[in-house]
């Protein structure tokens, strides 16, 4: 029996609900995308301890339990879709348009704009969009169950966009092939930016979220902040309809000055997102070690204490994914940098994102493409440092079959 465990869950539930300020804080934080820290919303939303336990798993990043299987419940797909790449000369104007598009609803009170993906000028340049210099685009999608509903949606969105200054008139298409080209541009940003980065640098992607009303000012300030720290090749893109942006930087950690520049950037990002706008430092991708030092700054003492209590209840020995979400080192994001030694011109372009593995012919047979690259980089690192020649020989010998013959 796990009666004691269940009683502890109920006690945490009651502790949270008995603190009005904390309850309101939790509801406010989850009014936008937020995966920073442990998921506290189940303690507010559910009464049954089993439901609370199941929902605590969401976003726990392996710190509470091992998930052996997941069943996904899919939603019905709309039969009719239309997309447009809407170009603006100014990122602030683009953000204001997104805020207004989010308000559009059908007769049932459902949003008629289903996606509004922001692509700033560097994002567009990375994927070869030549529409114009220095533009910002919003990839906009609407969906419907009938052609008539789709046409009505497109007309309403077009009417709204007519109130804004566009670089060229918006043109929606319901052609699946044309829409696929738009979305291929969107999905190609991360690998394009990473693949063109200076050799030896690390491609880092962060994702933050703002409340939708703050989006125009926050977007411009985030762009200016990144530029102020000298990241001239950085780009901002993402799910603007949800106030959620990704930004990509190419960072060298080869000198103390570069590490200090990165530290200053992250401190300023935290101050902008949390201190100024009370947003989320992590909207989708999980806290990880890079944001763990900023957990208390975002959530405050009371919420962090509950998160710690959840962790200690599930994992009293601290064995599961240590250092992730909770880390007592306030500078843990500035140590143990992963080296990317120069290895081969082709290999040096790899950002180790793993997107290629779904199409890799040898993944599961011997080594995937990414695994081969990791081994090659480790051999190069050991050779460059002059350390452990015995390990170098073992790696080279062991690599021959899985890395070269298959």
List each model region and its residues.
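Activity-critical C-terminal alpha-helical subdomain
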Residues: 192, 196, 293-342
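FAD-binding subdomain of flavoenzyme oxidoreductases
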Residues: 1-93, 97, 317-327, 331-342
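Feature representing long, continuous alpha-helical segments
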Residues: 65, 220, 245, 267, ...
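Short Cys/His-rich zinc-binding micro-motifs
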Residues: 350
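C-terminal substrate-recognition/cap domain of FAD-linked oxidoreductases
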Residues: 34, 42-50, 54-264, 272-280, ...
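Short beta-alpha connecting loops at secondary-structure transitions
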Residues: 80-84, 203, 253-258, 289-298, ...
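N-terminal leader/propeptide and maturation segments of large enzyme subunits in energy/redox metabolism
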Residues: 1-21, 136-159, 167, 365-371, ...
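Ferredoxin-type iron-sulfur electron-transfer modules in oxidoreductases and energy-metabolism complexes
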Residues: 326-347, 357, 363-406
């Amino acid at each position: 029996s796990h009666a004691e465990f269940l009683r502890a869950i109920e006690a945490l539930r009651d502790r949270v609900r008995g603190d009005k300020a904390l309850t309101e804080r939790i509801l406010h934080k989850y009014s936008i995308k937020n995966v920073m820290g442990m998921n506290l919303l189940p303690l507010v939303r559910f009464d049954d301890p089993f439901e609370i336990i199941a929902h605590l798993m969401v976003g726990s990043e392996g710190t509470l339990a091992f998930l052996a299987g997941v069943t996904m419940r899919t939603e019905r797909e709309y039969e009719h879709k239309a997309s447009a790449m809407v170009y603006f000369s100014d990122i602030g104007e683009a953000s204001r348009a997104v805020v207004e598009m989010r308000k559009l609803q059908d007769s049932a009170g459902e949003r008629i704009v289903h996606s509004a993906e922001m692509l700033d000028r560097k994002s567009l340049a990375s994927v070869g969009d030549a529409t114009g210099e220095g533009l910002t685009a919003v990839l906009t999608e609407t969906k419907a169950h009938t052609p008539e509903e789709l046409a009505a949606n497109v007309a309403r969105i077009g009417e709204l966009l007519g109130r804004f200054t566009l670089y060229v008139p918006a043109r929606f298409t319901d052609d699946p092939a044309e829409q696929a080209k738009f979305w291929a541009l969107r999905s190609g940003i991360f690998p394009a930016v990473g693949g063109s980065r200076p050799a030896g640098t690390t491609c880092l992607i962060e994702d933050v979220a703002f409340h939708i009303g703050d989006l125009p000012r926050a977007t411009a300030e985030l762009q200016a902040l990144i530029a102020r720290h000298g990241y001239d090749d950085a780009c901002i893109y993402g799910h603007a309809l949800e106030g959620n942006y990704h930004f990509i930087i190419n960072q060298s950690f080869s000198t103390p000055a570069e590490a200090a520049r990165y530290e200053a950037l992250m401190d300023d990002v935290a101050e902008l997102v949390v201190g100024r706008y009370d947003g989320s430092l992590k909207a989708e991708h999980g806290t990880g070690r890079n944001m763990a030092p900023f957990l208390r700054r975002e959530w405050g003492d009371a919420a962090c204490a509950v998160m710690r209590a959840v962790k200690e209840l599930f994992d009293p020995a601290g064995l599961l994914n240590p250092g992730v979400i909770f880390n007592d080192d306030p500078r843990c994001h500035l140590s143990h940098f992963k080296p990317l030694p120069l290895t081969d011109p082709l290999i040096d372009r790899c950002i180790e994102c793993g997107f290629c593995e779904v199409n890799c012919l040898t993944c599961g047979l011997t080594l995937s493409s990414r695994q081969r690259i990791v081994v090659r980089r480790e051999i190069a690192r050991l050779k460059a440092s002059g350390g452990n020649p015995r390990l170098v020989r073992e790696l080279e010998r062991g690599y021959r079959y899985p890395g070269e013959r298959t």
